[in-house]
A protein has these predicted regions:
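Cross-family detector of peptidyl-prolyl cis-trans isomerase
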Residues: 2-162
Length: 162
């Protein structure tokens, strides 16, 4: 029994080391990718280090979301390898989400956008899923999102005025 427990403990320790190594490798790749990307024409950087490019600007005067807004968006998330890990386009329908429940990069960027805007975000790991990763997203991975803000919706239980 002790031998089984020792083997299990060693297996877990090795798996943790492998995840840490993967995160470190991805963090290095993220730094290189983002440093090079920042030099491209049209790429701007937000205070957090999230980079963005305006693909299409919507009409002026549209209402920007706040941190607690519900937003209707179409989006595609990719790794820097080009692998798509999530896409509302592939599902054939936009998503409605509460902004304060999203990754920090989305919260920051969407508050700068207006309905009709389409941006490409280049997300450092600490503004995405960090050293843990999530699902198909490896630990420490930089991310690329194409986001189209379709609408800012009234929060549930609130009366929209005007």
């Amino acid at each position: 029994m002790r031998r089984v427990l020792a083997v299990a403990a060693m297996t877990l320790a090795l798996a943790a080391c492998k995840a840490d190594q993967t995160a470190l490798e991805n963090l290095g790749a993220a730094q290189s990718f983002l440093a090079e990307n920042a030099r491209k024409p049209g790429v701007k950087t937000l205070p957090s280090g999230v980079q963005y490019e305006v693909v299409r600007a919507g009409p002026e005067g549209g209402r920007k979301p706040t941190a607690r807004s519900l937003v209707k968006v179409h989006y595609e998330g990719r790794l820097i390898s080009g692998e798509v890990f999530d896409s509302s386009y592939e599902r054939g329908a936009p998503a409605v989400m509460r902004l304060d429940r999203l990754i920090p990069a989305w919260v920051e960027a969407l508050q700068q956008m207006r309905p009709g805007d389409e941006w490409t975000l280049y997300v450092p790991p600490e503004q995405g899923y960090g050293e843990e990763g999530a699902g198909q997203i490896p630990p420490g991975a930089p991310l690329i999102f194409r986001i189209e803000l379709i609408d800012v919706l009234p929060a549930p239980g609130r009366i929209q005025q005007g």
